Amino acid sequence: TLMRSSAASDVYKRQRTRFGPQELAALAREVGRICRRTLETPQVLSCKGMTTLLFSERPVLRAVFGMAGAAARGSISGDAVQQFCSPTAAQMILCDGMGTGRPAAVDGNLAAELTARLLKAGIPAELAARLVNVALALKSEEESGATLDLISVDLYTGTARLFKAGAAPGFLVHGGRARAVGDVSLPVGILGGVNGQSRVVHLCAGDYAVLVSDGLLVDGTAWVAKQLELSAAAGEAPAQVAKTLVETARARALRTGRPDDITAAVLRLENGG
């Protein structure tokens, strides 16, 4: 929109078009009616005096996140979690820094934060892993590394892409049945390349995806799968699922005398409405 400036001369300046929440909602309904689609409230983008409204179809699914953790010693954990939704997908990342304490926390948080930024920029998981590998290798002359565990779920189709580099097995709960997924591979930052593994699965409303650090699996995967099936049958929220897993794993670790950082990150899909 062009408006006359307050100056005495006949000079005009550009002003961004502004929309209120009710106006944006009304626009979404009207454009959706024309397109015969249910649309989200549009994003308002302004650049060089031009305002653009970006409409997108409402996703079929929505993601609900939850996480819980316990440090092996003190209050510093080497595990780091990132959970967020991009315009079309739900993203969940868990990185486990080598060892425990502050050095592990630095590596874990660096890997998770950098991976999240790359994914938000549209970088594929495999390429993001290679870039994180280089970053960790150059961080210091001392050996450092972190596992990289991520899942990306398309909220329109339910297609889930999993990528693991050195990470502990994760879990999927589909149709009420839980199963472990993932094999052994090297963490990022250890070698010149990344020996990661990727997999594609299909999820739907009511399903869970769970990423855990190796400290949670001190007694194996069987009890985790059983607990997840019980939690799914009860319809527990992701935050409660994660809390139960961590508390149970912590008690088991204390009995065995092998404490480690313990973390669980949980994603549940629900109908988008």
Where are these regions (language model features)?
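Regulatory cytosolic signal-relay segments
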Residues: 18-77, 169
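Single conserved hydrophobic/aromatic residue that forms the stacking wall/gate
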Residues: 1-8, 12
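Residue-level marker for buried hydrophobic side chains located in beta-strands
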Residues: 93, 164, 209-211
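PP2C/PPM family metal-dependent serine/threonine protein phosphatase catalytic domain
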Residues: 57-79, 129, 133-141, 168-200, ...
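Short hydrophobic/glycine-rich mini-motifs in sensory/regulatory modules
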Residues: 6-7, 60-62, 87-91, 205-208, ...
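Short beta-strand-to-coil "C-cap" segments at the C-terminal boundary of structured domains/repeats
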Residues: 56-58, 267-273
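Active-site-proximal, acidic helix/loop segment immediately C-terminal to a metal-coordinating Asp/Glu
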Residues: 97-121, 179-180, 184-185, 190-192, ...
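Catalytic core of PPM/PP2C metal-dependent serine/threonine phosphatase domains
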Residues: 26-49, 105-175, 249-260, 264-269
